[in-house]
Amino acid sequence: MSCPEQIVQLMHMHLDGDILPKDEHVLNEHLETCEKCRKHFYEMEKSIALVRSTSHVEAPADFTANVMAKLPKEKKRASVKRWFRTHPVIAAAAVFIILMGGGFFNSWHNDHNFSVSKQPNLVVHNHTVTVPEGETVKGDVTVKNGKLIIKGKIDGDVTVVNGEKYMASAGQVTGQIEEINQLFDWTWYKMKSAGKSVLDAFNPNGEE
């Protein structure tokens, strides 16, 4: 078409319903004298009428479901990989719990050896550990698979793992007392110990 660009713009304005009366008059005069523009305008009107006539057509209710059913099934491994990529923190925590929980489970069932912390004024006989009356034991005391009898003073925490604790009337503990006789308690204790070791490694001088 060699007609002015303005005429094409007026066609679009007319089809959009935005044309002014004076501009519509200009367009009509041109269409009466220009066969090419008149044919082009007629084709545009037919196209718009066709689109409007099909605007009420809707896809069947089950169209989406049918299309999805015909698509290739995603491999289960791929969906698992996608879940791990979108939930990295949860995945890491789950793996940590599985690995650490399994290790703690084996440790709990296989470790039956008696052990005790190494303070010099603890009295150890067979599997019995005694804090003598009048003695003050400095630091945390841990007894595994044995018995702890407290007659004196412990200046720290007490942890008895899979054992027994007796405190005489004169016995004293300045810190916390924890008795661990269940697998869950053991797991929690080991996790706390590991966390404490990490903190100590980053803060060797005990600074806050």
UniProtKB/Swiss-Prot annotation:
Is processed by successive proteolytic events. First, the extracellular region of RsiW is cleaved by PrsW (site-1 cleavage) in response to cell envelope stresses. In a reconstituted E.coli system PrsW cuts between Ala-168 and Ser-169 followed by trimming by E.coli Tsp; the endogenous extracellular exopeptidase responsible for the event in B.subtilis has not been identified. Next, it undergoes cleavage at an intramembrane site (site-2 cleavage) mediated by RasP. It is a single-pass membrane protein. Keywords: Cell membrane, Membrane, Metal-binding, Stress response, Transcription, Transcription regulation, Transmembrane, Transmembrane helix, Zinc. Signal peptide: none annotated. Changing S169Q: Wild-type; retains anti-sigma-W activity, degraded by PrsW. Its main location: membrane. It is found in: Cell membrane. The chain crosses the membrane at residues 88-108. Zn(2+) binds at C3, H30, C34, C37. Induction: By different stresses causing damage to the cell envelope, such as alkaline shock, salt shock, phage infection and certain antibiotics that affect cell wall biosynthesis. Residues 109-208 are extracellular. Its cofactor is Zn(2+). Residues 1-87 are cytoplasmic. GO terms for cellular component: plasma membrane. Binds 1 Zn(2+) ion per subunit. Absence of the Zn(2+) (in a residue 1-80 fragment) does not prevent interaction with SigW, nor does it change the overall conformation of RsiW, although a disulfide bond can form between Cys-3 and Cys-37. One of its GO terms (molecular function) is metal ion binding. The cytoplasmic domain is able to inactivate SigW and the extracellular and transmembrane domains are crucial for sensing and transducing the signal that triggers SigW activation. The N-terminus binds the zinc ion and is followed by a long helix (about residues 40-80) that fits into a hydrophobic surface groove on SigW, probably blocking its ability to interact with the -10 and -35 promoter elements. Forms a heterodimer with cognate sigma factor SigW, which probably prevents SigW from binding to DNA. The anti-sigma factor for extracytoplasmic function (ECF) sigma factor sigma-W (SigW). Holds SigW, its cognate ECF sigma factor, in an inactive form until released by regulated intramembrane proteolysis (RIP). SigW and RsiW mediate cell response to cell wall stress. RIP occurs when an extracytoplasmic signal triggers a concerted proteolytic cascade to transmit information and elicit cellular responses. Belongs to the zinc-associated anti-sigma factor (ZAS) superfamily. Anti-sigma-W factor family. This is Anti-sigma-W factor RsiW. It comes from Bacillus subtilis (strain 168). The gene is rsiW.
